[in-house]
Amino acid sequence: MVVHALIYIFFNYDKPGLIKGWAVPIATDTAFVLGIVSFFSRHISLELRTFIIGFSLIDDAFAPIILS
């Protein structure tokens, strides 16, 4: 979660109107993770896929708290 927010702040630091949107990228990482895992699904073991998707879902469980 922190990495997404820091990347957003890095690119929008000099834009005062956009700096308040730092929480939005936090909620989008699961979509990217699912896309990447499905693309490489033949090369990733089932255990690793389960761990990556589970970690991403736990990470996104905190997104509504931050967004509200």
Swiss-Prot record:
Recorded topology in the membrane: Multi-pass membrane protein
Any single Gene Ontology cellular-component annotation: plasma membrane
Record's protein name: Putative Na(+)/H(+) antiporter NhaA homolog
Family designation: Belongs to the NhaA Na(+)/H(+) (TC 2.A.33) antiporter family.
Primary localisation category: membrane
Domain of life where this protein originates: Bacteria
GO molecular function: sodium:proton antiporter activity
Keyword Cell inner membrane: yes
Transmembrane segments: 21-41, 48-68
Entry annotated with the keyword Membrane: yes
Protein's GO biological process: regulation of pH
Subcellular location: Cell inner membrane
